[in-house]
Amino acid sequence: MAWNTNLRWRLPLTCLLLQVIMVILFGVFVRYDPDADAHWIDERLGRNISSDMDNEFYYRYPSFQDVHVMIFVGFGFLMTFLQRYGFSSVGFNFLLAAFGIQWALLMQGWLHSFHSGYIVLGVENLINADFCVGSVCVAFGAVLGKVSPVQLLIMTLFQVTLFSVNEFILLNLLEVKDAGGSMTIHTFGAYFGLTVTWILYRPNLYQSKERQSSVYHSDLFAMIGTLFLWMYWPSFNSAVSHHGDAQHRAAINTYCSLAACVLTSVALSSALHKKGKLDMVHIQNATLAGGVAVGTAAEMMLMPYGSLIVGFICGIISTLGFVYLTPFLESRLRIQDTCGIHNLHGMPGIIGGIVGAVTAASANTQQYGQKGLAHAFDIDATKTTWTASMQGSFQAAGLFVSLAMALVGGLIVGVILKLPFWGQPADENCFEDAIYWEIPEDQKSLVSRSEDPTLRPTEP
């Protein structure tokens, strides 16, 4: 089997075909939300709204800006740590996110915002589409450097579809609370990506080992991504919460958890090195685990000290995962996790689901007040049998559903991506920008071996 990485026809045709389909589907199904439509003046009068500043745009757009930066800048630059894969890390993240948000607007729209035959599109839809793509960016981290852009587009197509179905099951059928997406975004995205990379296992990947590492400047670029993600994560976890106390509380809980996570990550990184030195991999990734783990319970009455405890624990677990678990997964289970998403998103996502279930199960009127409890968990007159323990049970069920959807979906998509005609690189040519990008002349001399697009992997 020839390893032909020439994408001259495959990539343009795939991009153009997908975009034409998006144009047609948007033309048929998508219309503006009343808050974005030119009839807003009449809508405002009908709803007795006195000012344009009460438009939903002004409540949600600041959070949308922050989330948007996280998806395109934060995730993109976080993955630039590979010394010869910076163009692809940022560029392919840009590509899959740009396609993913369009398909997510349609998939989530059909499931959540379909009225009178149309999807009504407002600023909250844009935030939710970014959330969906965030899950794809998480999965991208597992296969980084080992797949072609065509494979990434196909993976995005299927993952967005599966994400939207999983999200509908959790939020609409099980009615779980998951403001920051610990279960829907991080757990689903991580275990979907890990399953895909398990199916795409490369036995000769050691031949690219010298490129599967960082250099001084690539780690600095990755740290830029870390800082953007760390600063904006409170917006991420609070972006779609109810206005008022819930959104305020979600930002505070995330802020506290992230802060605690940094100190424990630094402590463990130093303690686990025989000379007490820090590892940039831990500082770039484990310091963010607190934001992941507090996501489900972000808008609940977790209390600031509870958020600090969550961040404290996740900093330890994530750092230990990078040191001990990632090598074990690769050597024993054949899971080649390029970015260590299991440590940043997988395990913290599961912890977040558990924390959310426990916090929901312990909710009471003393903590929330009668009206506050009803508002926090959307209890109305139809939910006469609702109890906190029941909510906790549904929260736990949501975690298992996310895991099941991720594993089954990852198996199916992994098999599809394993087909030989997607333009994937040979094992010895992984983690190399020159395969798919025109690179500066002064960098071409650094390529350690021939990048023949028909090159086959060397037999062991």
Swiss-Prot record:
Residue intervals annotated with topology Extracellular: 31-61, 108-125, 175-179, 241-251, 307, 362-396
Q: Which organism is it from?
A: Sus scrofa (Pig)
Pfam families linked to this entry: Ammonium_transp
Gene name in the database record: RHCG
| Sequence similarity | Belongs to the ammonium transporter (TC 2.A.49) family. Rh subfamily.
Spell out the molecular function terms from Gene Ontology. Answer: ammonium channel activity; ankyrin binding; carbon dioxide transmembrane transporter activity
Q: Which UniProt keywords apply?
A: Ammonia transport, Cell membrane, Glycoprotein, Membrane, Transmembrane, Transmembrane helix, Transport
Domain of life of the source: Eukaryota
Protein name per its UniProtKB record: Ammonium transporter Rh type C
Q: Which residues cross the membrane?
A: 10-30, 62-82, 87-107, 126-145, 152-174, 180-200, 220-240, 252-272, 286-306, 308-328, 341-361, 397-417
Name the catalysed reactions. Answer: NH4(+)(in) = NH4(+)(out); methylamine(out) = methylamine(in); CO2(out) = CO2(in)
Q: What is its main location?
A: membrane
InterPro entries membership:
Ammonium/urea_transptr, NH4_transpt_AmtB-like_dom, RhesusRHD
Q: Which residues lie on this side of the membrane: Cytoplasmic?
A: 1-9, 83-86, 146-151, 201-219, 273-285, 329-340, 418-460
Q: Could you tell me what this protein does? A: Ammonium transporter involved in the maintenance of acid-base homeostasis. Transports ammonium and its related derivative methylammonium across the plasma membrane of epithelial cells likely contributing to renal transepithelial ammonia transport and ammonia metabolism. Postulated to primarily mediate an electroneutral bidirectional transport of NH3 ammonia species according to a mechanism that implies interaction of an NH4(+) ion with acidic residues of the pore entry followed by dissociation of NH4(+) into NH3 and H(+).
Q: Give the quaternary structure.
A: Homotrimer.
Sites of glycosylation? 48
- List the GO terms this entry assigns under cellular component, sorted alphabetically: apical plasma membrane; basolateral plasma membrane; cytoplasmic vesicle; plasma membrane
Which cell locations does it reside in? Cell membrane; Apical cell membrane
Which positions carry the signal peptide feature in this UniProt record?
none
What post-translational changes are documented for it?
N-glycosylated.
Membrane topology per the entry is: Multi-pass membrane protein
